[in-house]
Amino acid sequence: MSYNYQHIIVKPIGGRIGAEISGVDLSSNLVEDVVNEINQALLQYKTIFFKGQHQLDDIGQEAFAARLGTPLNHPTVPTKKGSNHILELDSRGGRADTWHTDITFIENYPKASILRSVIAPEVGGDTVWANTTAAYEHLPESLKVLADSLRAVHSNSYDYAASASITTEQREKYREIFTATEYET
């Protein structure tokens, strides 16, 4: 799929996933043509990056997210104090240090997740993405037939299944933040 971008600069960064977008200030009042092209790049590349957006604050992030669609709050984790939709994560606690998908255990799952690094570590802190569409498309036909015949229960119960080796204080803090509501689709 090829698209002729007129309002943003799109530089692919991987064979099957990812592009860096430049020539746009996400904190500004973006014109509809720019928003449409950002959406097109998201569809085409699955993961898009905007570097150097230091001027973007919580209000700007929420405004940008709303231009891409209706923001969806995490059903079991409260939003950041003073925001409508932002889920604040930090490097402590290892809450997302395994392969996962964001909120896909609910019936009407989000189109995308928007991450904004406010303070990045000098080393580590890497986030990795996978293109499951490309993975499926490159399966041998026999495995596609098998995959198409399978059914599964998708749930967030894993979030509560294991007891991590954390202190009592950390566990209490975790329970303050997370609501132990299980979803299943």
Which residues make up each language-model segment?
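Non-heme Fe(II) oxygenase catalytic core, chiefly the N-lobe of the double-stranded beta-helix
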Residues: 2-185
